[in-house]
Amino acid sequence: MKRDYYEILGVSRSADKDEIKKAYRKLALKYHPDKNPDNKEAEEKFKEANEAYEVLSNDDKRRRYDQFGHAGVGSSAASGGGPGGFGGGGYADINDIFEMFTGGGRARGGGSPFSGFEDIFGGGFSGGGGRRARSTGIHGTDLKIRLKLTLEEIAKGVEKTLKIKKQVVCSECNGTGSKSGKTETCQTCHGSGEVRQASKTMFGQFVNIVACPTCGGEGQVVKDRCTSCYGEGIKQGEVTVKINVPAGVQDGNYLTLQGQGNAGPRGGAPGDLIVIIEEKPHDQFKRNGDDIIYDLAVGFPDLVLGTKVDVPTLDGHVKLTVPAGTQPNTMLRIGGKGIGHLKGGGSGDLYVRVNVFVPKDVSGKDKEMLKELKKSSHISPNHGEQDHEKSIFEKAKDIFG
């Protein structure tokens, strides 16, 4: 996910142009490739600063970015075209940058902090000559949402219907950004969305291919902007989506719904909707892969003599037989009562962990019975040396009848 442009430059959202320019100059000098040879991290930071400044130094792009985020400037920003011709893979010599910072260069090209290079085309930019066709509009951004599910829903799979807020196509202009619904071919780049910019440095001349500054890299311009969407072709709206979640998903898994993300400005293709799964904690069961675990407390007499109990599952109750002589922490398995496998082909199991129930308060009669039971030499763990004829469970059966 792209970082916030204000965060990249280290300025507030209310920063004026001078503050933005100063912040950019500082970063450009610090991370310039000439100063950091073979340093990929510095190169990426330099590109980030270029991209951020290209947007925030332009009033129209900054307004669109403040309103729509990266989606509003996606095409021009993503092109890598830096201010004053420093994007697109070419970098000015750092000595020239320093000279311009200290006032040694001639200011031209709309106030770029790196302006001052002599452009061989005379006007700063020339048309791309229609080298290639441009796709319509800017691609919409992906939208991420979180979906909380119960263990019961995860076990069987579920269909969810949700209302989500996202950028939708403007109904007033049908997404064109134009009142009349029409756009015109950009006269600067002749529809290619790109221009060539040539500059001279102390090491010679270099040429960059950058996004057209007139159309933002789209190849089309809007003359009569729609007043409802300010010429963007998209607005904030609310839509209803259906999400089919298969059985067996886990916390952190995600589903991608192609084309259901934010609409693209001015007819651009929509982004994707990314649904991140969050599993709600369950008050009875613990999950272990596709198996689930349930803790069952059973009284001591039932552990000794055996019993049948009702056990909850994810889809109702079942009868479980606790065999006589079951030891604490024994796991009893109920097959197929776990969570459906994500790839199909059955379900996990339910494991019942049996523990002994110890009451905090007992009646006088119960105390007398326990005292009588305690007298038995076979009720304590070291009874084996005293009597080998009957086991502890056989003795307990005799006492409890």
Swiss-Prot record:
It comes from the Bacteria. GO terms for molecular function: ATP binding; heat shock protein binding; unfolded protein binding; zinc ion binding. Pfam families: DnaJ, DnaJ_C, DnaJ_CXXCXGXG. Its cofactor is Zn(2+). Gene3D superfamilies: DnaJ domain, Heat shock protein DnaJ, cysteine-rich domain, Urease metallochaperone UreE, N-terminal domain. One of its GO terms (biological process) is response to heat. Belongs to the DnaJ family. HAMAP family: DnaJ. This is Chaperone protein DnaJ. The gene is dnaJ.
